[in-house]
Amino acid sequence: MTYRNANRMMASAVLLTSLSAMSHAQKPPVPEQDWATRPVLRVWPGPAPGSETDTRKESTMHPPDSATMHIVRNVTVPTLTVFQPKDGSRSKTAVLICPGGGFRLLAIDQEGYEVADWFEQHGMTAFVLKYRVAETPPKDEDFSPPNMPMQEQIKRILAPLPPDAVPHAIADGIQALKVVRENAAKYGYSPDRILALGFSAGGGVVTGTMLAPNPADRPNYAAPIYGALLGPTPEIPKDAPPAFLAFAEDDPLVQPMVLRLFNALRDAGNKPELHVYRTGQHGFSMTERGTSDHWLQELWWWMELFGLTNP
């Protein structure tokens, strides 16, 4: 698969994660007034490198056919939203969560805030990363006109990504890990117990961080869920972090890239864990779709293996 075709394939995941996902049974989203008042940390001390002259305005909107879910577009200022247990962290592990959205938007609820809320309720501090995404029309009605035929939506989504979209997102992920580690004492977790968890395109961000050439740029543990790097998998570092991978067998988008990553990790002696669910399609995250409903509990069991759920 060429890098360009991989880009187009991953970009089409936007429709599945952010548009068609609304037709599946979902758990209630985290109330807007809850996450809107949580602490927010800047990822970069100044303008994000490469975006110094970008004047786009970030936009949050409801996807078609959903009055409760949110997607975020035109992110140019990466941030971390903090979810911390009200009675303090019961575990010294922190989780960095990277939502998906084809590098064009962020499915911020079902692949971000809802996941962070789950970890918070289980005694862990979690951070939801808004990383930079490719430009989309500034007006919501131009991005997703109410009566636009699905074929036209697909045509828009499958347009080639800008060449800097993926590198910018990965750079934001690496810098976000630094910010999470810098805030370990403040929020009560260990800087060497950081799990990076990402979905779809966010799984690509996580994979980019776990394979970073500089060990200091990597998370301690990584969980790319139905996502991996676009194009060829780079050389696997000998000391790459332990990895938990998962996707659904009926997901037509990411099987080759996830299996390629799994095999590369295994060949490098990483001993990755892979879960392939019979049902779930692409973008199952916190929705109810079948056997994939249990991925989060299985991730928790994997974390127990490494002592990450302990105080």
Residue map of PLM features:
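N-terminal cap/lid segment of alpha/beta-hydrolase-fold proteins
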Residues: 27-89
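Short beta-strand element of the alpha/beta-hydrolase
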Residues: 91-100
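Active-site glycine-rich loops that stabilize anionic/oxyanionic intermediates
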Residues: 99-104, 249-250
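Short amphipathic alpha-helix adjacent to the substrate-entry channel of hydrolases
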Residues: 109-127, 263
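Alpha/beta-hydrolase active-site loop
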Residues: 143-185, 297-298
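Primarily recognizes the serine-hydrolase "nucleophile elbow" in alpha/beta-hydrolase
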Residues: 165-239
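The feature captures the conserved acid-bearing segment of alpha/beta-hydrolase catalytic domains
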Residues: 220-276
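C-terminal catalytic histidine-bearing segment of alpha/beta-hydrolase fold enzymes
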Residues: 266-311
